[in-house]
């Protein structure tokens, strides 16, 4: 068919077929999203909180480097669904931070995004009303306000970075970050980790594979180019300098991997690439085989390893809340205050016991 040109082309335009839509066939616009800059202006970080975040990051980096013999403890609810209960928990944790300051670096787990194997509630930011209404602007405001309040109490915060955009809204308030078991192998999450200003832990795969976490650490230590909105919502090409504080989180898989043999095996994999032989053990998930009270058993084993002189154990993770266990979201039924709506957690009394055991074990390092 000959190409139409000149006057013929002008005439042809009058009879052009209307454009057929081939994109956005499965999406519907919900709302405009506030920009990170607008949110930070609405809920600004104070100089005192900024100093607190930077100081906490430096302390965590020293622990990961082996320059501080204390133990990093990431502890808190599986996920945040009730900011009021989260602040209540943070106040309790602040007292224990002060009590165990010479032995433990206690950081509160403040997870706002939940990865799902198939479907389920995806976290406070996505669905703050717990009803599928997806008021993301409200959720992201609640998350930032909570982080400001918890940090103002003197408690550093930790979170999992899942969505590639959410970090722009809250990462300035985070002292330690995690990349989850389902995303550790993802290239874009490794690139994001290389850009983050806080230390980042990579979980082993859901099947227990630690090699993907080692590869993620190596990738995150190098420079990357990636595309992302900036604080004002403009699409931007970024170059990262790399994150030297990546580390493995041993979270178990089909079987637990907190035992000394598994820790030694992970250290050998790190040694192969001249990476620091320091790691964090998750007491929950595959290591407790979804039985939340077994976190206390995992704790006892880790305490014995610390007393036996293990230098690999830089930190631990614990799922803990005010009330033990978990609950389901049921329409018309009020939720139990201070109890998880995702993974079951240890209650407050058991959490105090666990922290005391860890503090006593760390005495042998000092």
Regions found by a protein language model. Name each.
Residues 72-85, 343:
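Conserved phosphate/anionic-ligand binding catalytic regions in large, soluble enzymes, centered on
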Residues 36-44, 240-252, 335, 339:
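Gly-rich Lys/Arg/Thr-decorated short loops/hinges at beta-loop-alpha junctions or inter-strand turns
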Residues 18-24, 90, 103-258, 262-263, ...:
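Active-site-facing alpha/beta catalytic cores
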Residues 76, 281, 347:
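Conserved, mostly hydrophobic/aromatic
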Residues 25-64:
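N- or domain-start disorder-to-order transition segments that initiate the globular core
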Residues 321-364:
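Internal helix-turn-beta structural module
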Residues 13-31:
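Polybasic, low-complexity association/targeting segments
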């Amino acid at each position: 068919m000959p190409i139409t040109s000149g006057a013929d082309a002008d005439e042809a335009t009058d009879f052009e077929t209307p454009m057929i839509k081939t994109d956005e066939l499965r999406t519907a616009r919900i709302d405009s999203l506030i920009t990170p800059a607008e949110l930070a202006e609405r809920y600004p970080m104070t100089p005192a909180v900024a100093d607190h975040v930077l100081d906490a990051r430096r302390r965590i980096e020293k622990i990961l480097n082996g320059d501080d013999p204390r133990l990093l403890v990431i502890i808190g609810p599986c996920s945040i669904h009730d900011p009021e209960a989260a602040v209540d928990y943070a106040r309790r944790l602040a007292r224990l931070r002060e009590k165990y300051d010479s032995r433990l670096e206690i950081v509160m787990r403040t997870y706002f995004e939940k990865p799902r194997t198939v479907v389920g509630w995806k976290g406070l930011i996505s669905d703050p009303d717990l009803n599928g209404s997806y008021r993301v602007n409200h959720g992201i405001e609640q998350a930032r306000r909570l982080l400001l309040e918890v940090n103002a109490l003197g408690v550093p915060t930790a979170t999992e970075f899942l969505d590639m955009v959410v970090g722009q809204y809250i990462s300035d308030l985070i002292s330690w970050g995690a990349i989850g078991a389902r995303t550790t192998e993802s290239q874009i999450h490794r690139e994001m980790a290389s850009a983050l200003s806080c230390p980042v832990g990579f979980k082993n795969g859901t099947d227990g594979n630690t090699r993907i976490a080692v590869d993620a650490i190596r990738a995150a230590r190098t420079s990357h180019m990636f595309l992302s909105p900036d604080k004002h919502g403009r699409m931007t090409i970024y170059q990262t300098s790399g994150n030297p504080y990546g580390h493995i989180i041993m979270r178990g898989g089909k079987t637990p991997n907190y035992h000394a043999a598994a820790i030694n095996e992970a250290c050998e994999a790190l040694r192969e690439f001249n990476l620091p032989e320091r790691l964090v053990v998750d007491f929950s998930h595959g290591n407790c085989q979804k039985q939340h009270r077994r976190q206390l058993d995992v704790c006892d084993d880790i305490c014995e390893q610390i007393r036996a002189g293990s230098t690999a154990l830089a930190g631990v993770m614990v799922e803990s809340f005010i009330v033990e266990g978990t609950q389901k979201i049921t329409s018309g039924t009020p939720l139990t205050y201070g109890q998880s709506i995702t993974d079951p957690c240890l209650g407050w009394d058991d959490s105090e016991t666990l922290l005391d055991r860890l503090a006593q074990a760390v005495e042998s390092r000092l």
